[in-house]
Every structure is written in C-alpha cells, then in structure tokens.
C-alpha cells in the first residue's frame, strides 16, 4: 500500500537505496547510471526510481532538505517497504582547510543542532554513527577509484543560513556541515539497518568558494559512483 508520501506499491522499491536531497539528482542518477529504470514516486515532486546497476536491483529517491524531511522518507522506506541499506549522497560545506571543493567526505559520525533526536533521548546525547561496514567499503572503493576522499565527523545543522561558528567547528576536526545525515544515522540505529552519508563539498564556508546549482545537480558523479558501488557491495 502507498504511504502518505510515497505512492509505490510493495515490491516496487529495492532493499538498497541511494538518497540524494535533490529529486532532480535522483532523476539524473536513474537516467545516467541505472538500466531499465522505472519511476515509482512523484508525490510532492519527490522523484523515486528503481532499476538495475551492474545487475543488482537498486532504487534512488530524493529526500528534500533537513532532518525532518529525510526522516519522513527514510521511516517509510524502512518500515513500509523493507529497505535495509540507505546511503545519502548529497552536498556539504567544508569547514576544514584540508577539505576542498569537489572532494568527497564520508561521515563516520554526525553531530547535530537538531532537537529531533532529543525527543527520544531528552536526558543525554545519543551518538549518530554510520554503519562501519558501509563506511569501510565506501572509503576503499573511493580510494581504488582515485577520488580524493576524507573520512571524519560532520555536523548536521538545522540552519542553512547562519548556524554554528564554522571556524570553531573546524577546529574540533569536523570535516563538513550538511543538514541530513544525523537523522538518517539515528534511524539506522533505531531500526537496525545500514546507513551512510557520502557528501561532495559544494561550498567552502571558510574561503567562500562555491559551485553552481547546475553543477550540484549534474556533475557530482564521483559521489554517485561511490554510492552505487557501496550499495551493491557484498
């Protein structure tokens, strides 16, 4: 049965899925990387597709921006459609001098300014951590492909404009700031499924460097390749 936000029938979504924030990036991935891709969702413009990649059945779907949005879709994908492996492929802003525009960042753990997780844990901070097996595979896949990749802590912020002091955050070793991974990692722990965030640096908060919206939608293919290869890895 369809959910309030996903119109797919049972069986139309694979148990492995890529989750870009931008639904047009989901369409780009389906059109350029998947064979026999079929669209399973367009509710609220959040496009989703299922196809095959190197003979493996996989899906890709947009999530929108922020932890509330990705949490809605990830919850429904896990609880209603049986998805077991979810990899976010999105953009992030660097807060580290050694992490440059178009580099990849794999988030080993995600701090957050969001209060959503505190609804379940009001008395202490619950750590949002990626699935180590997926992280390890993604890192080695990226290295084998010769892609500049950093592994470390990231920050999932509720604010795109404003938010935590970038210099202070960077001094703590945080690699980048984005808006979704902590929520996805928390749901991974809650439902005992595999989750990971692979981000491309689209902006450098310290230097002011940036990429265009068209670049963010259409050219960050390294992240897509690493995400797909990790998704189908044994």
Swiss-Prot record:
Annotated positions binding phosphate? 21, 25, 44, 88-91
Q: List the disulfide bonds.
A: none
| Gene Ontology, cellular component aspect | cytosol
Entry EC number(s): 2.4.2.1
**Record's keyword annotation contains Transferase:** yes
The residues that cross the membrane are: none
Question: What InterPro entries does the entry give?
Answer: DeoD-type, Nucleoside_phosphorylase_CS, Nucleoside_phosphorylase_d, Nucleoside_phosphorylase_sf
Protein's job:
Catalyzes the reversible phosphorolytic breakdown of the N-glycosidic bond in the beta-(deoxy)ribonucleoside molecules, with the formation of the corresponding free purine bases and pentose-1-phosphate.
Quaternary data: Homohexamer; trimer of homodimers.
Family of this protein: Belongs to the PNP/UDP phosphorylase family.
Q: What is this protein called?
A: Purine nucleoside phosphorylase DeoD-type
Provide the taxonomic classification. Answer: Bacteria, Bacillati, Bacillota, Bacilli, Lactobacillales
